[in-house]
Each structure stands twice: as C-alpha cells, then as structure tokens.
Swiss-Prot record:
The gene is Tmem9. The transmembrane domain (TMD) is essential for the interaction with ATP6AP2. It comes from the Eukaryota. This is Proton-transporting V-type ATPase complex assembly regulator TMEM9. The modification Phosphoserine is found at residue 144. It comes from Mus musculus (Mouse).
Length: 183
C-alpha cells in the first residue's frame, strides 16, 4: 500500500503543470448535424472558445448554400467540451496500480495456500471422531422419536427433522470419505 501511495505521488509530481494553451483534445466545440435534404449527417469538431461554440463558427466548410445556412444551423446541436487529459492519465495509472497490486496479492495467496491448508493428521483424526459421535447421537435420537408415539404434528415434524439431519450427516461422511480416498 505504501508503494502504491509512493507511485501516485511520484506520478503527480512528474506530470507537467496545466498550460493555458490546451490541446484540441482537451477543449473543443462539438456540433452534431443531422441529415438535411440531400446532405448526410455529420459531426464537426473545432478548437474554438466557448462563446464561439455555434454552427456558424464550427461547421466548415458549410455543406449548404447561403440561403439554407440558417435552417441547417438550427438543426445542429453544438456543445462545448472541456476535459483534463492529465487527470485522466493519473486516474488510469492509479487504477492500474491497484489492479496490479491485487493481482500480485492473489498470486502470493495462490503460492502460500498449499502451505496454509496443509492437513494436520491429529486434527483430522479428532474431526473424524467428532463426526462419528454426532452420527451416533443422531441415530439414537431418531430411533427414540420415530417410535409409535409420534402422534402429534409437532412430534412428526421433529421426527422428520431428525431423519433429515441424520441423512445429511451420513451424506457428509460419505462425501468426506470419498474426497479423502481421491486425494
């Protein structure tokens, strides 16, 4: 994280200061003119001041004769656009730095993961014993509830829950054993 902050600060210091003469990419007047009579639609970009951002100053050469210029210009939509490419570049560098750091962290975790998840034989044996005890208690509970006195709705629901829990426990044990045999 400190490296990322350092890269961002150095990037901001190395970027040249904003100039009064911005390039045509940073400041522009964009006019979108739709089709008019036999003339197809067109987009015009021009580096002009904000007060001159209209069809008469931006659309060059004028595609219509003199008497249709006013009607053509009324159809055109002109917008003044200003952006800072320096800011955009800095944001992209920061974004790529964060993504790169996350990718490095992911690669580190993938390398370290086998060492962290190394199974301990003693812990695995205790886990198996706990599962066997749980399965035995579930089986005895299911046998006692599943008897002839399960007359009420509540007792039937509890019996169904116990049977379901027993089935889930058996399935877990089977899946765990299969997984153990495969690896």
């Amino acid at each position: 994280m400190k490296l990322l902050c350092l890269v961002a600060v150095v990037g901001c210091l190395l970027v040249p200061p904003a100039q009064a003469n911005k390039s045509s990419e940073d400041i522009r007047c964009k006019c979108i003119c739709p089709p008019y009579r036999n003339i197809s639609g067109h987009i015009y970009n021009q580096n002009v001041s904000q007060k001159d951002c209209n069809c008469l100053h931006v659309v060059e050469p004028m595609p219509v004769p003199g008497h249709d210029v006013e009607a053509y210009c009324l159809l055109c939509e002109c917008r003044y656009e200003e952006r800072s490419t320096t800011t955009i570049k800095v944001i992209i560098v920061i974004y790529l730095s964060v993504v790169g750091a996350l990718l490095l962290y992911m690669a580190f975790l993938m390398l370290v993961d086998p060492l962290i998840r190394k199974p301990d034989a003693y812990t695995e044996q205790l886990h198996n014993e706990e599962e066997n005890e749980d399965a035995r208690t579930m089986a005895t509970a299911a046998a006692s509830i599943g008897g002839p006195r399960a007359n009420t709705v509540l007792e039937r629901v509890e019996g169904a829950q116990q049977r379901w829990k027993l089935q889930v426990q058996e399935q877990r044990k089977t899946v765990f054993d299969r997984h153990k045999m495969l690896s």
